[in-house]
Amino acid sequence: MFRNNYDGDTVTFSPTGRLFQVEYALEAIKQGSVTVGLRSNTHAVLVALKRNADELSSYQKKIIKCDEHMGLSLAGLAPDARVLSNYLRQQCNYSSLVFNRKLAVERAGHLLCDKAQKNTQSYGGRPYGVGLLIIGYDKSGAHLLEFQPSGNVTELYGTAIGARSQGAKTYLERTLDTFIKIDGNPDELIKAGVEAISQSLRDESLTVDNLSIAIVGKDTPFTIYDGEAVAKYI
């Protein structure tokens, strides 16, 4: 049986129970530049490598703020990430206006997954070709979620997505017992994230132009560092 008999849409299962279009969407994540997320009990951090198409273009935005307590980083198709981040921003505003409370981070992940899952079960759409790392802080503490276009969301202490992300993942696994205990010291958590992302680099080095950092936590609203603000972490 040929694979191309079953990969023309997202609603046809292969004889082995696979949805090939969804698997192809997961592969799109690996085309994006690497981004790292990690958290302790009090803070969560995103560290992302930005790319530019050529020497005459600006660097692509990799980290997006959704609310004062939440934001995300992307790997994959940036237009798809823009749609999802706008949706999440609307849900954050709705929660604040209607219920007078911040949207819980876990709830935000579930809302995104429900939106993504619809594109795996109906004609006329395609799966989102982007992976997201979502960080936030709510009454239950700091959170790090990984969103996949298959409709899965996972809460983690640390992970990396994008091209050559395995090096960063291996570093985080090796230092897990160290960085999860970094409470009340966000600079040390950021440095751990920068060291992790450097493990995924080959022919390039981190600079103030291609590095983007975000942090959120206890008494710390979601803040993005770009340009000279990241120099002290390199």
Swiss-Prot record:
It is found in: Cytoplasm; Nucleus. The 26S proteasome consists of a 20S proteasome core and two 19S regulatory subunits. The 20S proteasome core is composed of 28 subunits that are arranged in four stacked rings, resulting in a barrel-shaped structure. The two end rings are each formed by seven alpha subunits, and the two central rings are each formed by seven beta subunits. The catalytic chamber with the active sites is on the inside of the barrel. This is Proteasome subunit alpha type-6. Keywords: Cytoplasm, Isopeptide bond, Nucleus, Phosphoprotein, Proteasome, Ubl conjugation. Belongs to the peptidase T1A family. InterPro entries: Ntn_hydrolases_N (IPR029055), Proteasome_alpha (IPR050115), Proteasome_alpha-type (IPR023332), Proteasome_asu_N (IPR000426), Proteasome_sua/b (IPR001353). There is a cross-link at K191 (Glycyl lysine isopeptide (Lys-Gly) (interchain with G-Cter in ubiquitin)). GO terms for biological process: proteasomal ubiquitin-independent protein catabolic process; proteasome-mediated ubiquitin-dependent protein catabolic process. The proteasome degrades poly-ubiquitinated proteins in the cytoplasm and in the nucleus. It is essential for the regulated turnover of proteins and for the removal of misfolded proteins. The proteasome is a multicatalytic proteinase complex that is characterized by its ability to cleave peptides with Arg, Phe, Tyr, Leu, and Glu adjacent to the leaving group at neutral or slightly basic pH. It has an ATP-dependent proteolytic activity. Present with 7210 molecules/cell in log phase SD medium. It comes from the Eukaryota. It comes from Saccharomyces cerevisiae (strain ATCC 204508 / S288c) (Baker's yeast). The modification Phosphoserine is found at S14. The keyword DNA-binding does not apply. The keyword Ligase does not apply. GO terms for cellular component: nucleus; proteasome complex; proteasome core complex, alpha-subunit complex; proteasome storage granule.
